[in-house]
Structures are given as structure tokens and as C-alpha cells.
């Protein structure tokens, strides 16, 4: 194919992908001009901000801010559209990330409406930013992942120090969202890291990781061997690599899990599942699926998620939802154009 023909195909794919996104936005009653402006916001030069979009597309800035507040209601429409695309079993991936807000107008204190001064675990200090719960779906039949939600939340430390006036833990938020997803998708398994150990989440078919200091009541190797009930109870870290059936406490109850201990890239992994019938290979494969969400974190930050801050949480939630929809569209576009990354796509768009 000659270069001019390749460019024509690229333009066609670009228009098709973003027309789908614009159509989703318009389901909430937005005009086409506003929907196009929001859909293309992350691809215009400079910061991916609402003000930049209003200037570029000659849209009313105040009206765009109000539109963001209404975008929160678009989430159910977006899930409905995805449920028609994903018809097979899925794995729900739960994680979180820190969204730095370098341009936040809030300095040293939290916003009355949101938490714009949060603890950054990377830099070990409070910084302008937001803790964001992220949730993705992995289509087992097609081997494709979709980011389906990004939700700001407050930490317990912020609540106890009086920095925010509303509080819901990421575990409570994740549990609520999983129930919503089960109504629309065939959820085969849920995967998350060890920080989500809670009776609200560790139920059904879960694959996750245990900390090495977690105590076990009883443990039995699956390849022969007798049940161990060591006085004082063994820690997970005391066990050699292998597969085990183990009993341990979760809240006020005792549960049985399948424990798979691996050495992976010189690191020890203490994987477990509540579905004791899963094979070792299925457990490991499901755990590797969890890393799909880290790619989403990289992509939404490359698209400029951190470029704007808002005093009202509803506007922030709308802004995050916009990035959720855009990143899925961009990923489809990257694949169809045989590009390698969001950064490469952004360079490509300059010439299309």
C-alpha cells in the first residue's frame, strides 16, 4: 500500500473510532459540537484541559463545566453499550492509582468538594492529587481489555484528620461496582492485589495475593503430605513454593482457599483463589491479567488526565469518565493503525 493510501485508511479509522465515542456522549443529550470537543480534548495540542478545549473548539467554558457534572450519569449508558460488545465471560480487574494534580488551585488543604491534597505513596508525602479507584474488564473469549471506570476516593487517614467531609473506602466502592457489573456481564472471576483483603470483596471466584505475614490456621499440600496445624499457626511466608489448601480467618469467619506459591522473576508470589477447583495455570494466568490495568494507568496519564483540576467532585468524576471512554477508543485506534503506544498516536495525529 502506498503512503497516500495508508494515510487515507488511517483517517478513515480515526473518524470511525471517534464517531463511536461521540455517539456514546450524545446518548446523554449533548450537542454534536460539545461531544466532538470533549472527545478530541485529549488529542489537541497543549494541556488536555477543559479550558483548552473551550478555546480550540470555541465552546462556552462554563457550559462545558456543567456538562462534566452531567457526564457522571453517562456511565450506565456506557456500560450498556459495552455489554453489547462483550458477550462472553470476563475477569474484573480492580486497582488504584494516584492522579497528580499539578495545576490544582488548592494548596496545603483539601477541597470542600473533593480531596485534592492526598498522600502520594511514591513520593511519601502529601501532594496535590487524588486517589483514584480504577476498574477494568478482560474479555476471556477475545483476549481484550477495557477500562470501565475511574472513581476518586478519600483515604481513611484523610477522613480521620478532617481533610474531607465525605468518606467511602475503595473497598466499599469496589464492592458496589462489582455488583453493578454482575448485572450486565458474565463475571467469571475478580482479580486484585493484597490490599483488597476484605470480606466485602473476597467472595465468589476471586484471584489475589496474600502478604507473607498472613497467618494460616491449617494448610495441606495438594501433592500428598499431611495437614499442618503448627502451634502458633504458620505464616504464608513459611511455606515453600507449591500448591496448598489452606484455612484462614476472614473477618469473623474461617474460609478455605487454594494457595499457589511461585517464584516469579526472582520475587515470591503468594497467590490464592477462593475457587479451589481452579488449576495452577488458571490462577497464574488470571493474575497476569491484572497487569492489564497498569497499562491503562500509563495510557490515561499519557493522554493528559493530570492536566486539569476541579473544585467540584462531580466535575472531576465526569472528567475521569471522559478519559475512561477516550482511552478505550484510543487503544482500538492504536491497534487498527499498527502503532505501538499512546505517545506514538499523539505524534501521528499531528500529521493526519
Regions found by a protein language model. Give the residues of each.
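Single, function-defining residue in the core of a domain
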Residues: 1-30, 34-37, 44, 57, ...
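Electropositive nucleic-acid engagement tracts
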Residues: 25-33, 40-105, 226, 344, ...
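Short linear Ser/Thr-Pro motifs
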Residues: 49, 121, 273-274
Amino acid at each position: 500500500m502506498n503512503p497516500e493510501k495508508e494515510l487515507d485508511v488511517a483517517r478513515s479509522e480515526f473518524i470511525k473510532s471517534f464517531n463511536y465515542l461521540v455517539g456514546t456522549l450524545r446518548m446523554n443529550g449533548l450537542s454534536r459540537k460539545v461531544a466532538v470537543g470533549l472527545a478530541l480534548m485529549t488529542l489537541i495540542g497543549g494541556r488536555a484541559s477543559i479550558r483548552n478545549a473551550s478555546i480550540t473548539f470555541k465552546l462556552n467554558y462554563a457550559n462545558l463545566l456543567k456538562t462534566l457534572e452531567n457526564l457522571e450519569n453517562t456511565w450506565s449508558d456506557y456500560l450498556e453499550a459495552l455489554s453489547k460488545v462483550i458477550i462472553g465471560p470476563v475477569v474484573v480487574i480492580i486497582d488504584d492509582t494516584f492522579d497528580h494534580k499539578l495545576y490544582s488551585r488548592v494548596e496545603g488543604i483539601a477541597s470542600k468538594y473533593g480531596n485534592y491534597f492526598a498522600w502520594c505513596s511514591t513520593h511519601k508525602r502529601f501532594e496535590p492529587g487524588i486517589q483514584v479507584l480504577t476498574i477494568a474488564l478482560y474479555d476471556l473469549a477475545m483476549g481484550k481489555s477495557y477500562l470501565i471506570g475511574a472513581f476518586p476516593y478519600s483515604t481513611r487517614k484523610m477522613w480521620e484528620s478532617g481533610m474531607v467531609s465525605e468518606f467511602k473506602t475503595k473497598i466499599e466502592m469496589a464492592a458496589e461496582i462489582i455488583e453493578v457489573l454482575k448485572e450486565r456481564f458474565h463475571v467469571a472471576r475478580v482479580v486484585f492485589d493484597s490490599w483488597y483483603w476484605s470480606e466485602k470483596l473476597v467472595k465468589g471466584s476471586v484471584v489475589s495475593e496474600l502478604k507473607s505475614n498472613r497467618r494460616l490456621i491449617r494448610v495441606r499440600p495438594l501433592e500428598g503430605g499431611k495437614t499442618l496445624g503448627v502451634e502458633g499457626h504458620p505464616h504464608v511466608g513459611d511455606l515453600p513454593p507449591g500448591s496448598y489448601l489452606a484455612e484462614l480467618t476472614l473477618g469473623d469467619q474461617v474460609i478455605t482457599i487454594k494457595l499457589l506459591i511461585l517464584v516469579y522473576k526472582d520475587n515470591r508470589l503468594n497467590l490464592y483463589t477462593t475457587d479451589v477447583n481452579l488449576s495452577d495455570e488458571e490462577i497464574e494466568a488470571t493474575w497476569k491479567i491484572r497487569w492489564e490495568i497498569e497499562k491503562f494507568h500509563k495510557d490515561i496519564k499519557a493522554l493528559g488526565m493530570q492536566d486539569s483540576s476541579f473544585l467540584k467532585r462531580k466535575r472531576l468524576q465526569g472528567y475521569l469518565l471522559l478519559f475512561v471512554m477516550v482511552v478505550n477508543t484510543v487503544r482500538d485506534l492504536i491497534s487498527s493503525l499498527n502503532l505501538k503506544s499512546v505517545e506514538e498516536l499523539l505524534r501521528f495525529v499531528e500529521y493526519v
